[in-house]
A protein has these predicted regions:
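Mg2+-dependent phosphoryl-transfer enzymes with acidic/Ser/Thr/Gly-rich catalytic loops
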Residues: 4, 21, 178-264
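Non-catalytic pre-domain segments flanking phosphatase-related domains
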Residues: 1-7, 55
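Conserved ATPase-coupling elements of RecA-like P-loop NTPase cores
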Residues: 16-20
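Conserved acidic, metal-coordinating active-site core of Asp-based
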Residues: 105, 109-209
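Active-site phosphate-binding/coordination module
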Residues: 21-118
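Short hydrophobic/aromatic-enriched beta-strand-loop microsegments
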Residues: 59-65, 135-137, 227-232
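Residue-level detector of anion-binding/catalytic polar loops
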Residues: 37, 170, 226-227
Length: 264
């Protein structure tokens, strides 16, 4: 049976503090040798993921900005993907709203709801908040679908969620930021659509694995055959009611390596 591996990045494939993936080397080599699609499923942007893929040495499909879109390299595994819309050198399936729509809401509510969005932050502020280097900050600001933000007053969260709903938007929580996005998107929907697409392309059922550590990974974990939670940097685990969930013994990329080696 063909397999797909979906993975969150920050705190899962990448270590929380230094963004390293060095401890995942053994599992990565086995994935590459087996030809299993390793699908980064992340809140990061297209530019961020493409740069990371270069460093990792892969060219695979990926899901960006919390399930907003699936990108597939042109001619991936020899498939005819001409039925999908073209986007630069990729094919794309879009599930989210445009960044312009999201920013319209953010700008209307940012002051009354005490939000500080990525689009309003200086590069220096983002470096301080995230630990990213200058190049990665530039990639992070190249957004197409969602707006990450810091909520200065947590008592405003419920009112903000209600307001977002009237715009067909929603608020989710990631590892460092809250995110404004289409209410019709999440990692789970993107994973479902990706599995369906690959089953059509392969003409057979696929087995799916997902690894994550944050609240915005729950929808992804709910829709795969093997859901795996990676231990957080503080030693805790994401709380979820997903059946048959597995937990890593280690944090970050070491925990990712540990769990992937069980199945590849």
């Amino acid at each position: 049976m063909k397999r797909l591996i979906f993975t969150d990045l920050d705190g899962t494939f990448l270590n929380h503090h230094n963004y390293s993936f060095e401890e995942s080397f053994e599992a990565l080599q086995k994935i590459k040798a087996a030809g299993v699609p390793l699908i980064f499923t992340t809140s990061k942007t297209k530019a961020e993921v493409e740069y990371l893929q270069e460093k990792v040495g892969i060219s695979e499909p990926f899901i960006v900005e919390n399930g907003a879109a699936l990108f597939i390299p042109e001619g991936y595994q020899g498939f005819d993907l001409s039925f999908l819309e073209k986007y630069d050198d990729k094919r794309i399936m879009v599930f989210g709203k445009s960044y312009a729509k999201v920013l319209e809401f953010y700008r209307r509510y940012k002051e009354r709801c005490s939000m500080a969005g990525l689009s309003d932050m200086s590069d220096e502020e983002i470096v301080h908040l995230t630990g990213l280097n200058q190049r990665d900050v530039i990639h992070a600001k190249q957004r197409d679908f969602t707006e990450p933000f810091i909520l200065k007053d947590k008592t405003k969260l419920e009112a903000l969620k209600k307001s977002a709903h009237t715009y067909e938007l929603k608020i989710t929580k990631g590892g460092r930021f809250y995110h404004i996005m289409s209410k019709f998107q999440d990692k789970g929907i993107a994973v479902i659509k990706t599995i369906e697409l690959f089953e059509d392309l392969y003409h057979e059922r696929v087995s799916s694995i997902a690894l994550g550590d944050s609240e915005n990974d729950i929808a992804m974990l709910e829709h795969v055959d093997i859901p795996i939670v990676i231990k957080k940097y503080d030693g805790s685990y994401l709380e979820t009611n997903v059946p048959h969930i597995q937990k890593s013994s280690y944090q970050g990329s070491k925990g990712w390596n540990e769990m992937v080696l069980k199945y590849v």
